[in-house]
């Protein structure tokens, strides 16, 4: 099975390649960064490069598109680059995949495409998204690319799987989510300040995300699927578990206890369609961070 991965040097990309190697897939990686692992076919190239199609073999089974300008702060500072990379780069890959008859296009989207969550409501893939409630250039760029993929699928493009990733955490040294950041502060400081301890997300470990990508291989038609954690974990949950794991007690302060922010995207469809659900609970996930914080 021939698998192409854009953003192969990213946090998710490296974890995905590690999993794929155990499954004996034929891997081709694209990234603008220099390679850290020479043990697979790699091309240092920008996804906007019109010549990228030359490195895609004919009739590849899956193209997994992870590459993006993904930090929201970067997207706000550089909105033109954000849409150039995330939208035009994706269109260039769609064209390239079409020319080379790729069988399935898997697109890494995000739970941030969902607008406001009111009173911890659960949203699913059929929920109406009001772009007037969006203040994230990153989320808008992902929504535009999702729409472009739907349009191209309707025009005869290959099978399309859009995976809306939840808030991902895992063993890494930078670009932390709230999970890694809090765990590091509990480990290295005696005091931590958060907005509201009741703020919560359905955090999901990177290894569960990559397993979800693999589980979606071969999915027919056009599909949008959330890959999120099984339950909402609050900042208090993370702090309490971190203290338990590290056998340490710290002072916890709230700067805005009444400003509770909860995002609750369902993962029920993933269980139904691809038989996926997270396996890494928060305690095990936090323990995996110890060497990195």
How should these model regions be labeled?
Residues 68, 83-90, 106-109, 141-142:
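Short alpha-helix in the Rossmann-fold core of NAD(P)-dependent oxidoreductases
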Residues 36-50:
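Rossmann-fold cofactor-recognition segment
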Residues 47-85:
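NAD(P)H-binding glycine-rich loop region in Rossmannoid oxidoreductase-like domains
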Residues 81-83, 134-143, 176-180, 202-203, ...:
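Short-chain dehydrogenase/reductase
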Residues 9, 117-120, 143, 147-201, ...:
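NAD(P)-dependent short-chain dehydrogenase/reductase
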Residues 91-137:
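Conserved Rossmann-fold NAD(P)-dependent oxidoreductase catalytic core, especially the SDR/UDP-sugar
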């Amino acid at each position: 099975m021939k698998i192409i991965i854009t953003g192969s040097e990213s946090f998710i990309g490296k974890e995905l390649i590690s999993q794929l190697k155990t499954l004996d897939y034929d891997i081709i990686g694209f990234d603008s960064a220099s390679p850290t692992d020479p043990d697979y076919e790699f091309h240092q190239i920008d996804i906007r490069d019109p010549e990228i199609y030359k490195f895609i073999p004919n009739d590849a089974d899956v193209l997994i598109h992870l590459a993006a300008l993904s930090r929201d702060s970067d997207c706000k500072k550089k909105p033109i680059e954000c849409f150039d990379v995330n939208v035009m780069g994706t269109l260039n890959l769609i064209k390239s995949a079409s020319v080379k008859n790729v069988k399935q296009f898997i697109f890494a989207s995000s739970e941030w495409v969902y607008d406001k969550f009111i009173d911890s409501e659960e949203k699913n893939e059929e929920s109406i998204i009001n772009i007037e409630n969006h203040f994230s250039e990153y989320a808008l760029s992902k929504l535009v690319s999702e729409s472009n993929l739907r349009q191209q699928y309707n025009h005869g493009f290959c099978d399309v799987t859009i995976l809306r990733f939840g808030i991902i955490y895992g063993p890494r040294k930078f670009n932390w989510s709230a999970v890694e950041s809090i765990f590091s502060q509990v480990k290295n400081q005696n005091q931590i300040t958060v907005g509201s301890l009741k703020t919560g997300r359905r955090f999901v470990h990177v290894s569960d995300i990559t397993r979800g990508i693999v589980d979606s291989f071969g999915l027919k038609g056009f599909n949008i699927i959330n890959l999120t954690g099984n339950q909402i974990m609050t900042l208090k949950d993370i702090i309490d578990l971190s203290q338990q794991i590290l056998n340490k007690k710290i002072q916890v302060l709230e700067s805005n206890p009444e400003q509770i922010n909860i995002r609750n995207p369902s993962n029920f469809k993933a269980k139904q369609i691809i038989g996926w659900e997270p396996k890494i609970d928060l305690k095990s996930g936090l323990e995996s961070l110890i060497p990195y914080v």
